[in-house]
Regions:
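Short, acidic, metal-binding catalytic loop of nucleotide-sugar glycosyltransferases
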Residues: 54-63
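Cell-envelope/extracellular polymer assembly enzymes that use nucleotide-activated donors
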Residues: 35-37, 65, 241
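Glycine-rich, basic loop-to-helix element that forms the pyrophosphate-binding segment
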Residues: 97-114, 131
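A conserved acidic beta->alpha catalytic loop
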Residues: 55, 70-81, 126
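Acidic helix N-cap motif at the loop->helix transition within catalytic regions
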Residues: 50, 75-83, 131
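Conserved donor NDP-sugar-binding/catalytic core segment of glycosyltransferases
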Residues: 131-180
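Short aromatic/hydrophobic "clamp" motif used to bind/position activated sugar donors
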Residues: 119
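Short beta-strand/loop segment that forms part of the nucleotide-sugar
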Residues: 63-75, 92-96
Length: 300
């Protein structure tokens, strides 16, 4: 059965008996050392989310749970998740009412509902390849977060993948070379697999250009900085703020390139009207050497 938690800021028109009403999400399990928690953000895009869940269900490493961090989708998302529940160790669904873009807050709610010692953040339009979990497990190390990367897919290729239920996560390199020649992907290099070894630690203090679309962080490191900062609302900079505070607290970056790349389905550009405000918040965190979120996990 899919486990669901709903933040009751006010009653939702999509509420059903399947939702457990709770103002403050409560952890539903003990922390499990070998378990990875994959936290997927989504908002009203069930076709893309279905492709992501399909790819996760076929992972070579099965020791993970999935918690869907739902920024206020309609009931179709809950209906999509129910049949997938048998495919994972545990499938959780954390929902709050949609009020602008609140990825930081819903990720925090999902963290509180997760059980793994390692949290892997993944966007609901980013398809992982079969060894995604295995690679993140291999790279995980206390005191280091792993910044993965992505390949951007064109609108035309995205529409074909979703309409025809294609499985690009299983494509051979030759198919990706052809896609690159057609202009259907922005780059090919992330799809190559390289060991890199100690070279992955060379950019330990680099915090720019890291995206929470593919980011792995130890639970202890997340708790130390109080998670994401829900002061960031609207699109942009909440992931940069988290990374910056992690580094201020002593956590360092490990490069996940050539090991953990995901396939980012095309979508229209998000509303960026709050970006200037979020830039100011990020600048303040940088200037003040802040480690703790202003509105973090402890506020829930």
């Amino acid at each position: 059965m899919t486990l669901r938690s709903q933040s009751v800021e006010q009653s939702s028109p999509h509420q059903t008996a399947g939702f457990a009403d709770s103002i403050k999400p409560q952890l539903q399990c003990g922390i499990q050392r070998a378990l990875i928690s994959v936290i997927i953000t989504t908002y009203n895009r069930t076709d893309a989310l279905n492709a992501v869940l399909r790819a996760l269900a076929a992972q070579t490493d099965r020791g993970f749970e999935v918690v869907v961090a739902d920024d206020g989708s309609d009931q179709q998302t809950a209906q999509l998740l129910e049949p997938w529940s048998a495919s994972f160790v545990r499938l959780g669904h954390v929902w709050h009412e949609h009020r602008n873009f609140r990825a930081a807050e819903i990720r925090n709610r999902a963290i509180l509902q997760s059980c793994g010692e390692l949290c892997v953040f993944l966007d609901g339009d980013c398809i992982p390849r079969p060894n995604f979990i295995q690679a993140h497990r291999r790279l995980a190390e206390p005191g280091w977060f792993v910044a993965g990367n992505r390949v951007l897919l064109s609108r035309q290729l995205t529409e074909r993948i979703l309409a025809d239920h294609l499985e690009p996560e299983l494509w051979a390199l030759r198919q990706w070379v052809e896609a690159r020649l057609r202009g259907d992907i922005n780059r090919l290099q992330p799809l190559l697999s390289l060991p890199l070894g100690p070279l992955r630690r060379l950019g330990g203090a680099a915090w720019r250009s890291i995206r929470s679309a593919n980011l792995a962080i130890g639970r202890a490191d997340l708790l130390r900085v109080d998670g994401f900062d829900a002061a960031f609302s609207g699109w942009g900079r909440e992931d940069s703020d988290l990374v910056l505070r992690l580094m201020h607290s002593g956590t360092r970056r490990k490069d996940g390139r050539f090991a953990t790349a995901v396939l980012h389905l095309w979508h229209a550009e998000n509303d960026r009207s709050r970006l200037a405000v979020n830039d100011l918040l990020l600048h303040a965190a940088f200037r003040d050497g802040r480690t703790k979120a202003q509105i973090g996990l402890s506020s829930l």
